[in-house]
Structure formats: C-alpha cells, structure tokens
Amino acid sequence: MATKKSGGSSGNGRDSRGRRLGVKKFGSEKVIPGNIIIRQRGTKYHPGKNVGIGKDHTIFSKISGFVHFRKGVYNKTFVDVLEASSVS
C-alpha cells in the first residue's frame, strides 16, 4: 500500500472578469435617449451638449442624434450628441 497521501487541489486558479469599460458608441454613430456612450472610471471623457453623466461616470445620451467628440480647454475631451438636423 502507498504511504504517500495524494495532493489536494490548489485553492487558486481564478481571476476576476474584466470591467467592460470603454467607448460603446464611437464618433458619428447614431444614438437614442438613454444609450450608453462611454463607461469609464473617473472623467477621462467629460459630458458636453445633450449628454448626461451617471454616478459611476458613465456618459449617456439625452436626445436622438449622432455622437461627436471634441477637445476643449486644457485638452479635455468632451462628448456631445448632435441633432440630426445640425450634423453636416
């Protein structure tokens, strides 16, 4: 009979899933009210015209239109939603 006890399984070998952050709707994409445009930690992107910001810094659309990114003062990136009539 063998006197060596069999080894147990390791307690490791797991990892947490990714956070699924990032840009969900890119420039010139059509959005409707409530569409999530960006999921982020902190304000890497700042809310501009016709968008709102959630408590977890998620930027979402308030109107139907098209996504537009622009640089503001101090090189901040702003996200706007432009109405279809104002897009040229």
UniProtKB/Swiss-Prot annotation:
Keywords annotated in UniProt: Ribonucleoprotein, Ribosomal protein
One Pfam match, by short name? Ribosomal_L27
Chain intervals for the UniProt region annotation (Disordered): 1-24
Keyword field contains Electron transport:
no
Record family assignment? Belongs to the bacterial ribosomal protein bL27 family.
This protein's superkingdom? Bacteria
Annotated GO biological process: translation
- Supply the InterPro entries for this chain: Ribosomal_bL27 (IPR001684), Ribosomal_bL27_CS (IPR018261)
Gene of this entry:
rpmA
Q: Give one GO molecular function term.
A: structural constituent of ribosome
Its name, as the record gives it, is: Large ribosomal subunit protein bL27
Q: Which organism is it from?
A: Ehrlichia chaffeensis (strain ATCC CRL-10679 / Arkansas)
Question: Any one cellular component term from GO for this entry?
Answer: ribonucleoprotein complex
